[in-house]
Design a protein with these regions (language model features):
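Class I S-adenosyl-L-methionine
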Residues: 1-214
Length: 214
C-alpha cells in the first residue's frame, strides 16, 4: 500500500490515491487534461498497486486501519489526489474507516454520482469527519458545462474548475448556472491546502469552492 506524504500543493497532508481515469466516471471532462498523468512513473506505479490492492477491500481496509493507528499525529487526510470512488463497496469502506478514526478529518472530491447515490452517502448520513465535495467544470474547448445532477447539487458543496485563460467568460457562465446568491457564497482556493483549509470540513452551508485549472 502506498500513502503519499504530501506534495507542493497540499503541504504535509498525506493521501491515498488510485490511477487516474480508469477509476473515474466515464466521459469526465478532465480526462484529456488530467495533470496526474504527468506525475513521475514511480508515483503512477504506486497508484496502480493501490488499485490492485483495492480489489481486495478487506485487506485494504485492514492495512489502512493499521496505518492510521500507527500515525496518530495525522489530523487531516485526503482520499484521492488521483482517482475516484469506483464502486459502492469501496466508498462504504472509506466511510467505515472515517467512523473508526474520529480524530482524523478525511476529505475528498468526486464525480461518481451513481456510486454516491447507491451508497446512500448523503451528507446527513456521513460521519462529521468525512467531507465529500462534488466537482464541476466550466466549458473547456468543445466541452459544455459539466455539473452534478440536481439532487446531488442541492445537497453537497461543489468545487468549480475554472480555466484561467477564459476566467471572465466562465464566471459569467457559472453565475447563470448556479445563480448570483450561490456564487456570492463561493470561496476561491488559494492553491495551498496546508495554508487554505477550505475543503477540510466543508458542508453545503459553508458555500462552494472555486479552483483554477492546473
Amino acid at each position: 500500500m502506498h500513502i503519499s506524504i504530501g506534495n507542493s500543493k497540499m503541504g504535509p497532508i498525506p493521501s491515498f490515491s488510485l490511477p487516474p481515469c480508469i477509476t473515474c466516471r466515464e466521459g469526465v471532462p478532465c480526462a484529456k487534461k488530467c495533470y496526474v498523468r504527468r506525475f513521475h512513473k514511480s508515483v503512477l506505479n504506486g497508484y496502480d498497486e493501490n488499485f490492485e490492492l483495492a480489489q481486495h477491500l478487506l485487506r485494504l481496509e485492514n492495512e489502512l486501519n493499521t496505518w492510521f493507528s500507527l500515525h496518530k499525529a495525522v489530523k487531516i487526510f485526503r482520499i484521492h489526489v488521483s482517482g475516484d470512488y469506483f464502486s459502492v463497496p469501496y466508498l462504504k469502506m472509506w466511510i467505515r474507516i472515517a467512523r473508526k478514526h474520529k480524530d482524523i478529518q478525511f476529505f475528498s472530491f468526486s464525480k461518481q454520482w451513481d456510486v454516491i447515490r447507491q451508497s446512500v452517502a448523503w451528507p446527513h448520513n456521513l460521519p462529521k469527519n468525512f467531507t465529500l465535495i462534488l466537482s464541476a467544470w466550466m466549458p473547456i474547448g468543445d466541452r459544455d458545462v459539466w455539473m452534478p445532477p440536481k439532487d446531488l447539487f442541492d445537497e453537497y458543496p461543489i468545487a468549480y474548475i475554472i480555466d484561467p485563460k477564459n476566467r471572465t467568460e466562465q464566471m459569467i457562465v457559472l453565475e447563470k448556472e448556479i445563480g448570483t446568491r450561490r456564487l456570492l457564497r463561493t470561496q476561491e482556493c488559494s492553491g495551498n491546502c496546508d495554508a487554505c483549509g477550505l475543503c477540510f470540513h466543508r458542508r453545503k452551508k459553508d458555500g462552494d469552492i472555486l479552483f483554477t485549472l492546473h
